[in-house]
Amino acid sequence: MAIESIEINLKTQNCRVFTTDGIVDYPCSTALNGPGEQDGSGCTPRGSHRIRAIIGLGEPANAVFVGRRPTGERWTEQLHEGYPNRDWILGRILWLCGNDSGLNRGGKVDSQRRYIYIHGTPPTEPMGIPLSHGCVRMRLQDICELADQVSPGTVVTIVES
């Protein structure tokens, strides 16, 4: 199954993956602050993007990342309790780069410079509800499955409906 493209729907909180074999849907969670492109907004950027980098291949599904680097920690409920306010980035990171100059590429709206990712989140976090700080959160099993099949350059389109 080769992945052709990905669509993130902000209204339905769904990650739709278009493959040579059909369509696969995954629940996701985007920004609590809604759609938007400005640096510092905490919003999920709209428009056409591409996967710049895939980070974490070969790491355990519950590997913890800070600054796109594995910390050596493994997420557990006990670790979570010790850091209740941490914005957990787990498992895999698909780092997005905007394709639309002026909308999500360049200046104060650059998705890559804003560190917008599709990444794993703890199983205690709900899907289908916008709660992130701008990234697209997915269940650990789902992001690991997606990261294993996607390649850099894959187009990711983020739409409002």
Which stretches of residues belong to each language-model region?
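N-terminal post-signal-peptidase region of extra-cytosolic proteins
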Residues: 1-4, 27-41, 73-80
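Short, charged beta-turn/beta-strand-edge "cap" motif at the junction between a beta-strand
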Residues: 13, 55-58, 161
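Exported/periplasmic cell-wall-interacting domains
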Residues: 61-161
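Gly/Thr-rich phosphate-binding beta-strand-loop-beta motif of the actin/hexokinase/Hsp70
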Residues: 9-18
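Glycine-rich catalytic cores of cysteine/serine-nucleophile enzymes that process amide/ester linkages
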Residues: 10, 22-50, 55
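Short linear motifs in intrinsically disordered
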Residues: 1-9, 146-147
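A short, structured loop/turn motif at beta-sheet edges
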Residues: 20-21, 110
